[in-house]
Amino acid sequence: AYGEAANVFGAPK
């Protein structure tokens, strides 16, 4: 879930 959300926030991970 986090990995997917990180893609939205543009986070490194």
From Swiss-Prot:
Q: What is its main location?
A: plastid
Source organism superkingdom: Eukaryota
Q: Which GO terms describe its cellular component?
A: chloroplast thylakoid membrane; photosystem II
Write the record's keywords in alphabetical order, separated by commas: Chloroplast, Membrane, Photosynthesis, Photosystem II, Plastid, Thylakoid
Gene Ontology biological-process entries:
photosynthesis
Which regions span the lipid bilayer? none
Where found in the cell?
A: Plastid, Chloroplast thylakoid membrane
Extra facts: On the 2D-gel the determined pI of this protein (spot N179) is: 5.9, its MW is: 22 kDa.
Q: What does this protein do?
A: May be involved in the regulation of photosystem II.
Q: Which family does it belong to?
A: Belongs to the PsbP family.
| Name the record gives this protein | Oxygen-evolving enhancer protein 2
Organism per entry: Pinus pinaster
